[in-house]
Amino acid sequence: LKLMLLGIKKGWFPPLPETGNKRSMIHVDDLVRAILLVAGDDRANGEIYIATDGTLHSSRDIYNVMCNALDRSIPKWSVPKFLFDMAALISPRIKYKVDKLLGDECYSSGKLEKLGFKAQKTLKDMNETDF
């Protein structure tokens, strides 16, 4: 995400296609709230929790929010997915990067919600320093 943010800021990161991929995010303020909740609840002893904002986002959604956070206009065009797929054929390293960028990475914070957690901020609430 930091590289994407830097690339958008400098003007060299390509507009991502809308692939419908699913990614989880959480605002740092909500993450801190989740940590404090778990630290203060005896039911959490020895447990592992995942914290998300409860919404699935596409990489294009994240790209658009980053553009807004940087006060950059959102391009009306995008690099076609097949070009990313072709680039992924060049090497395993590039394939890994393309998969990380356009693949799914979604999680559930349902277990944490049973302790009473509910995210208060959304992806759109994030600004440059949150990424």
Role assignments for model-derived ranges:
Residues M25, L56, C106:
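Short aromatic/basic micro-patch
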Residues V28, L89-A119:
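Conserved C-terminal active-site "lid" loop/helix of NAD(P)H-dependent oxidoreductases
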Residues K2, D29-V32, R60-D61, G110, ...:
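Residues in well-ordered alpha-helical elements
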Residues L5-L16, R72:
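A short C-terminal helix-loop "cap" of Rossmann-like NAD(P)-dependent dehydrogenase/epimerase domains
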Residues L1-L3, L16-A39, G46-E47:
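Substrate-positioning beta->alpha
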Residues E113-K114, K121-F131:
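Amphipathic terminal alpha-helices
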Residues L37-Y96, F131:
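Mid/C-terminal beta-alpha module of Rossmann-like enzyme folds, strongest
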Residues L3-G7, R93-Y96:
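Short, hinge-like loop/turn segments at secondary-structure boundaries
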